[in-house]
């Protein structure tokens, strides 16, 4: 009986450890579960840039956890190599978060981001890298996608997002990037004290706090 319980507990822990997420649209640089906890999910080289709306555009993920916390942020560097590259533009302008910090349940989820509204000088043809940070309770995971922003670009009809998870989950922070909204839940390798702070670490603690607060989630 003890052996059976041990096997069941071990199996549960193993299955939990294997739970991850995928970035399905825009397409991720790549996915290897064992290295998803690294910067850009372990894929540090810029890939082919995909067209993406300069204005509002959809992001689709597949969550493998029963509950997880998600946030999106961007870099305007042509070759981002660290989280610092997602903090400021080349002229020192602080880059706000690209999404709210929000929660999702297991399954396919989507949310919309409006990169033009970040007011960091993005225009038609701007090249950015989108990074998604995801925490299902067993550590932060990451996925990156390299984009070229197109004014008026229409995504395929099957990729639109009408059930926006970042809005229906009563997100804890807005994309305005204010330090007040993010500092309680985030730290950074950067010493800046204003604007968005990335990487947003400690999402697990934030998930717990949001759960206790009784947020409405998808």
Swiss-Prot record:
Record's cofactor remark: Binds 1 copper ion per subunit.
Signal sequence segment: 1-19
Domain of life: Eukaryota
Protein location: Cell membrane
Xref: InterPro entries: BIM1-like, BIM1-like_dom
Topology in membrane: Lipid-anchor; GPI-anchor
Sugar-bearing residue positions: 87, 91, 124, 158, 170
Cofactor: Cu(2+)
One of the record's GO molecular function terms: metal ion binding
Binding locations of Cu(2+): 20, 65, 138
Ranges for region Disordered: 160-194
Disulfide bond sites: 40-144, 110-161
Keywords recorded for this protein, A-Z: Cell membrane, Copper, Disulfide bond, Glycoprotein, GPI-anchor, Lipoprotein, Membrane, Metal-binding, Signal
Keyword Lipid biosynthesis attached: no
Lipidation (GPI-anchor amidated serine): 190
Gene Ontology cellular-component terms listed: plasma membrane; side of membrane
Compositionally skewed regions (Low complexity) per UniProt: 167-194
Subcellular location, principal: membrane
Proregion residues excised on maturation: 191-218
Protein role: Lytic polysaccharide monooxygenase-like protein that has diverged to biological functions other than polysaccharide degradation since it does not perform oxidative cleavage of polysaccharides. Cell surface-bound protein that functions in the copper-accumulation pathway shared by the CUF1-dependent copper transporter CTR1. Involved in maintaining cell wall integrity during copper deficiency. Binds Cu(2+) with an estimated 1:1 stoichiometry and might serve as an extracellular copper ligand.
Protein name per its UniProtKB record: Copper acquisition factor BIM1
Gene name of this polypeptide: BIM1
